[in-house]
Regions:
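Secretory N-termini
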Residues: 6, 23-25
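Bacterial N-terminal signal peptides
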Residues: 9-21
Length: 331
């Protein structure tokens, strides 16, 4: 059974698309219609206010003029994002009880970038690379940005990064789903004691990579032996405080269904999904690699923005919960 295991060589079949879980979703009351488009400034204002030179580390600066232009475009405050979909609240049923006071709703934005590994191009000598097994050889490949609607083919190698919009503690949960709508057991795949030493605290602009670049396998291999396997459901949770009853282990661990269901019922909200109009195919940057490797390093105003933005309407002071799917291409 495919799982998102980082420390051992397993295979995963996936394609990142938008979804509604196969259960009865509750609609948020009085949710305003979504904006048809946004700019990266809507997201970047969540980051620390200091704005260093785009290439704070000289070793990150590319030699190619085209590459420099591409990276500069990723940090442009006027970068445009188009609305892809609105996801209903993942609550399994409407709330049966009326709150004592009318809840206050706020909007927060989570950044996600999906990456597909490939050999580096001649003008990408600055791009960080990952060791890849190609037959009996080991090669160094880089990763290129792809949109949330990308359909990955069998054998693609994929990663994703998550940028936090707030200070708190981040958790990433995964479970399989199948063509008949059934789902597998959920697993907590981040944090573990092997990732960042178990430290899952994040601040505005913190970038988290999955899988970690220092893992035995720093990518997911898109492949499956099950014909009824349809993909993976991923849930990102950022809580103001550490979640109770979560004891970290060296590897990912199973999470009780009732725990995930309670999170969905308590924290689920309407999610608007936006993909950038540009940036597809641009290789991983040294700035992003530096941000994921240094826990105290946050992305700042003029540094690369994510390829996909999830705009979430949630109740004030509650954990942020963002769902997305890794869909398998039909065989």
């Amino acid at each position: 059974m495919p799982r998102l295991f980082f420390a051992s060589k397993v295979v995963l079949i996936a394609a990142f698309t938008l979804f509604a879980v196969n259960v009865s979703f509750a609609q948020e009351p009085d949710a305003p219609p979504p904006s048809r488009s946004i700019t990266s400034l809507d997201f970047q204002t969540q980051r620390p206010k200091t704005a260093p030179n785009a290439f704070s580390n000289d070793s990150n600066a590319p030699k190619s003029a085209k590459r420099r232009r591409n990276i500069a475009a990723l940090g442009n405050a006027k970068r445009k994002y188009k609305l892809i979909s609105r996801l209903a609240s993942p609550r399994r049923a409407p709330l049966n009880r009326k709150p004592k006071t009318k809840p206050v709703y706020v909007v927060e934005k989570l950044g996600v970038t999906f990456w597909r590994l490939r050999p580096a191009k001649s003008d990408e000598e600055d791009a960080p690379t990952f060791p890849v097994e190609v037959g009996k050889r080991r090669e160094q490949w880089t990763a290129e940005r792809v949109d949330s609607t990308t359909k990955f083919k069998d054998g693609d190698l994929v990663r994703f990064t998550v940028e936090s919009p707030r200070t708190g503690y981040i958790y990433v949960v995964d479970r399989e789903f199948y063509t008949d709508g059934a789902t597998g057991k959920p697993s907590l795949i981040f944090p573990t004691l092997k990732t960042r030493g178990g430290d899952n605290r994040v601040t505005q602009g913190t970038l988290i990579e999955i899988p970690p670049s220092n893992a035995e396998m720093s990518y997911f291999n898109v492949r499956s032996e099950r014909r009824d396997y349809a993909g993976e459901e991923i849930y990102v949770v950022i809580s103001p405080t550490k979640l109770p009853n979560i004891k970290l282990e060296l590897r990912e661990q199973f999470l009780p269904d009732k725990t995930l269901n309670k999170w969905l019922d308590d924290w689920g909200g309407v999610v608007d999904v936006y993909d950038a109009e540009d940036g597809g195919g641009i290789a991983y940057t040294g700035t992003e690699a530096e941000a994921v490797s240094v826990k105290t390093r946050s992305l700042r105003l003029n540094e690369p923005s994510p390829q996909t933005i999830y705009s979430v309407r949630l109740r004030q002071n509650q954990p942020l919960l963002v769902p997305f799917r890794l869909n398998a291409r039909a065989k």
